[in-house]
Amino acid sequence: MPRENHVAKQRRIGERLSRAMVKAHMDRRELAALTGYSEAQIALWEHGRAPLYPAELIKLCHTLDVLPEWLLCWERRLY
């Protein structure tokens, strides 16, 4: 299986962030208010145009009630 490039991975993370926001019934404004990040920064993450650092990841996951592994698109591989 070919490895996914960095840009494609960031886009997938952004898609999952958007899905988590919908599931939590939260828009960018609400997420920004709860996390302290700007709406513009959240939009960059959603569109895969900015990296998500560990502290940001943890805060977003806690706020949206999702696992970091899910948001990062990690897949468990069974051998």
Name each model feature, range by range.
Residues 15, 19, 33, 44, ...:
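DNA-binding alpha-helical recognition surfaces that contact promoter or target DNA
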Residues 70-79:
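Short amphipathic recognition helices of helix-turn-helix/homeodomain-type DNA-binding modules
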Residues 23-47:
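Short alpha-helical DNA-recognition segment
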Residues 55-70:
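DNA major-groove recognition helix of helix-turn-helix/homeodomain DNA-binding modules
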Residues 1-26:
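A short, Lys/Arg-rich alpha-helix, primarily the initiator
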